[in-house]
C-alpha cells in the first residue's frame, strides 16, 4: 500500500534553510565567488640578476654614509717639515744671562785716549743715573709703606673698613705695575751696571799703569 504525501507533509519536510526568507536567504543563497572557486595559479619565480663582484674596500650603494666633518683649529696642526730644509748655522740656544751691550762696546782700556773717553761717558750719564735713582727710590718707599699698611690692617668689621682696605690695595697694585715706574726702574738698573763697568775698566787701567811705573828703573 503506497501512501502519497500531501502538500502539507511536503511543506513540513523542508529543512531550516528552505524556511529562511528575506535578506538572510538571499545572502546565504549567493554562489561562491568566482575567484575562490578557481585555485590561484602558481607564479614562476623571477630570475635573479647576476651580482657584480666589487672589491671589498668599495662600499655598496646602501652602505654609503656621510661622516661628520672634524673641526681642527690652526693651533692644533703640526707644522709641516720642508722637503728641502735650508742649512742654518748651529744654534747655541737662548742664553740665560745675555751679555749687556756696554760690556761689548767698552772693552778693557789700553791707552790714555780710551781712558779719557770712558771717563767722559761716565760723567755724562752719572747725572741721569742720580736723578732716576732718587725717583725710583721714592716710589719704592711709597710701595713699602702701602704694603706695610695692608699687612697691618685688621679684618674689616664694616663696609667702610672693607672699602678702605680695597682702596689701599688698588693703589698699591697701580703703583707697582705702573709702566712709567717700570721703565724708570729698568733704565736706572741699566745705567747702574754701565757706570760700574766703566769705573772698573778705568780702575784696571790705572792699576796697571801704577804697577808698570813701580817696576820701571830710571837712570
Curated annotation (Swiss-Prot):
Lineage of source species: Eukaryota, Metazoa, Chordata, Craniata, Vertebrata
Record Pfam families: Occludin_ELL (PF07303)
Biased composition, class Low complexity, residue ranges: 17-43
InterPro entries for the chain: ELL/occludin, Occludin_ELL
Family as reported in the entry's similarity comment: Belongs to the ELL/occludin family.
Composition-biased stretches (Basic and acidic residues): 72-93
Segments forming domain OCEL: 100-210
The protein's name in its UniProt record: Occludin/ELL domain-containing protein 1
Gene source species: Mus musculus
Gene: Ocel1
Region (Disordered): 1-110
Amino acid at each position: 500500500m503506497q501512501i502519497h504525501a500531501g502538500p502539507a507533509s511536503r511543506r513540513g519536510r523542508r529543512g531550516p534553510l528552505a524556511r529562511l526568507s528575506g535578506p538572510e536567504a538571499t545572502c546565504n543563497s549567493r554562489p561562491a565567488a568566482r575567484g575562490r572557486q578557481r585555485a590561484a595559479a602558481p607564479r614562476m619565480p623571477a630570475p635573479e640578476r647576476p651580482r657584480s663582484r666589487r672589491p671589498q674596500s668599495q662600499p655598496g650603494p646602501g652602505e654609503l654614509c656621510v661622516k661628520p666633518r672634524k673641526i681642527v683649529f690652526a693651533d692644533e696642526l703640526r707644522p709641516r717639515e720642508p722637503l728641502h730644509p735650508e742649512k742654518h748655522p748651529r744654534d747655541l740656544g737662548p742664553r740665560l744671562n745675555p751679555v749687556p751691550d756696554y760690556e761689548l762696546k767698552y772693552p778693557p782700556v789700553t791707552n790714555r785716549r780710551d781712558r779719557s773717553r770712558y771717563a767722559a761717558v761716565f760723567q755724562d750719564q752719572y747725572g741721569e743715573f742720580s736723578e732716576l735713582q732718587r725717583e725710583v727710590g721714592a716710589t719704592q718707599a711709597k710701595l713699602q709703606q702701602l704694603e706695610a699698611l695692608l699687612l697691618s690692617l685688621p679684618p674689616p668689621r664694616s663696609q667702610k673698613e672693607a672699602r678702605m682696605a680695597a682702596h689701599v690695595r688698588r693703589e698699591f697694585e697701580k703703583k707697582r705695575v705702573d709702566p712709567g715706574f717700570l721703565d724708570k726702574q729698568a733704565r736706572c738698573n741699566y745705567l747702574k751696571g754701565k757706570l760700574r763697568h766703566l769705573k772698573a775698566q778705568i780702575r784696571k787701567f790705572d792699576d796697571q799703569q801704577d804697577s808698570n811705573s813701580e817696576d820701571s828703573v830710571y837712570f
